[in-house]
Design a protein with these regions (language model features):
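Class I SAM-dependent methyltransferase SAM/SAH-binding core
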Residues: 15-18, 22-67
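Conserved alpha-helix/loop element of class I SAM-dependent methyltransferases that forms part
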Residues: 1-15
Length: 222
């Protein structure tokens, strides 16, 4: 697939600067590429071929090996959204993130939240067996990406003690609980729902049962 500049994704690596900007893990970089310098790393060639690329950015097909080749303190922001759950080498990835992040940079990490997944199984999918399995500590499964290896927010600090959690938000606390699909298409409903989601995103009782958690991490001050 060609980007807007007509450069094949695999050949862009030598042509883009990573002296500043954003590192995005996965294929969601297009959203952030407008007005930013973005480098994206995705191990799946198939996913890269299907990605949106109407904004120019550097797409690398690779995984942890690609991160190892990048210079220290290359990025102001690192985005890792719903990725670590599927990675076998999470601790190594986090150490690379720490190395690649500038001293005042931030790591934006979105992760599955086990209690929220249990809510989804019971309330939305009526699947009590999977809910019981999750409550017993078993992993989940995604048809697109495979096994979901759940982890706790605090595990990030255990795996890489140089990070600290600056902020924690709940994502999709209410949205999917509304099963009237016609509502989802209504812009007025969407606006009110987003306002409600934002209002409770940092309130612990609601955050605890959100489908996802959004962690903002930074380097500990030395």
């Amino acid at each position: 697939m060609l980007n807007p500049a007509g450069i094949p994704a695999q050949s862009q690596r030598s042509r883009c600067s990573i002296s500043r900007g954003i590192l995005s893990i996965g294929v969601t970089a297009n959203h952030y590429a407008e007005g930013n310098d973005v480098v994206a790393v995705e191990p799946s060639e198939e996913s890269v071929q299907k990605r949106w690329d109407d904004h120019p950015y550097c797409q690398i097909v690779g995984s942890t090996d690609a991160l190892r080749q990048m210079p220290d303190e290359s990025f102001d922001v690192i985005l890792c959204h719903n990725v670590l759950e599927y990675a076998p080498d999470r601790e190594e990835i986090l150490r690379e993130f720490y190395r690649l992040l500038k001293p005042q940079g931030i790591l934006s990490l979105v992760k599955h939240n086990r209690p929220g997944r249990v809510m989804q199984m019971v309330v939305l999918l009526n699947d009590f067996d999977k809910a019981d399995a999750l409550l017993s500590g078993e992993d989940g499964y995604s048809a697109d990406y495979g096994t979901i290896h759940y982890y706790e927010d605090e595990d990030i600090i255990k795996w890489c003690s140089g990070f600290r959690i600056k902020e924690t938000y709940g994502i999709r606390t209410f949205w999917d609980l509304q099963q009237n699909q016609d509502c989802h298409k209504d812009p007025a409903w969407q606006e009110k729902m987003v306002a409600a989601e934002l209002r409770v995103s940092q309130m612990q009782p609601y955050r605890d049962v959100a489908f996802f958690h959004h962690l903002i991490l930074c380097k500990k001050e030395v």
